[in-house]
Amino acid sequence: MCIRDRSVKSLVWYSPDNFEDNGYEIPQTMEELVSLTEKMASDGNTPWCIGLGSGGATGWPATDWMEDIMLRTHSPDVYDMWVSNEMPFNDPRVIEAMDVFGSFALNDKYVSGGTKAVATTDFRDSPKGLFTSPPKCMMHRQASFIPAFFPEGTKAGEDVDFFYFPAFSSKDLGRPVLGAGTVLTATNNKPATTEFMKFLMHPEAHERFMGKGGFLTPHTGVDKGKYASDSFRGLHDILTGATTFRFDGSDLMPGAVGAGSFWTGMVDYVNGKSAKDVADAIQASWDAIK
């Protein structure tokens, strides 16, 4: 098995011009991000664009928020127990993380269109608020794939940039990163297959892809200069600088939960259902398939 490509989800996208015009600085901790959110709202700006819409998959963007927050409020071991259901979904620590997400998403002053728009805004349309004049929002938390849905002609590093979704300094949990990856598996043990898999572990193999764009490697031995853009070099620094890396939790859960009750539960949450009731319902769905 060889993991040859990863995506980073622990990102916040923003317009450098909007930040400069308003005197905002990149937050280095979650406490600073919370304070920045409050300041933006008090300045009359809308801090966040959040959209959970995705057709039959509506709700998944909120599961990413939850996973990132779990990694920032509790240890990696707790995250792993949550994902495997060794720790029940309705554990108080999970409910706490959901309410941290709610502190951003359930405040009408913090979200473009107000809380009522969170569940109905398509995730592909959500970041467009960064680029309107005046801007409809100042920040958008989403993975490294989202530039594919930015307005045509948007220049990364100029019109838009990103920063690491920061950790709580008070929690002392380092720099956790949430992501996903492509895993290659050999289906036979032929010599040529074995040699190819070995080759994919070498920096040279990764560097051949890096220059083509759209490829992010976790390999620490590559020459970052081989990336096609500064943006990808920045993503590489976030990825390889992680003190903890965890795969998307919902992707690791049984489909009935991770691509079912977890998605719909987060929609219920932003539509007014309590975190405890949502967590209880998700746990019940997990119990039903055991």
Q: Model segments located where?
A:
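Glycine-centered hinge/linker elements that transmit conformational signals in sensory
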Residues: T37-K39, V83-V118, F165
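Periplasmic solute-binding protein
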Residues: I3-I26, E31-V34, N45, G51-W82, ...
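Short helices/loops that flank or line small-molecule/ion binding pockets
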Residues: N18-F19, S35-D43, D122-H140, T264, ...
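A local structural motif
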Residues: N22-E25, A105-F123, P135-K136, G153-D159
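Extracytoplasmic/periplasmic substrate-recognition and gating elements
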Residues: D21-N22, F145, P151-L216
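Conserved C-terminal helix/tail region of periplasmic/extracytoplasmic solute-binding proteins
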Residues: E20, G44, L239-K290
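Short amphipathic alpha-helical coupling segments at ligand-binding clamshell hinges
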Residues: R93-V100, N189-L200, A205-F209, S231, ...
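Short, solvent-exposed loop/beta-turn-alpha elements that line the ligand-binding surface or hinge
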Residues: G56, L71-E96, E152-K155, A167-P176, ...
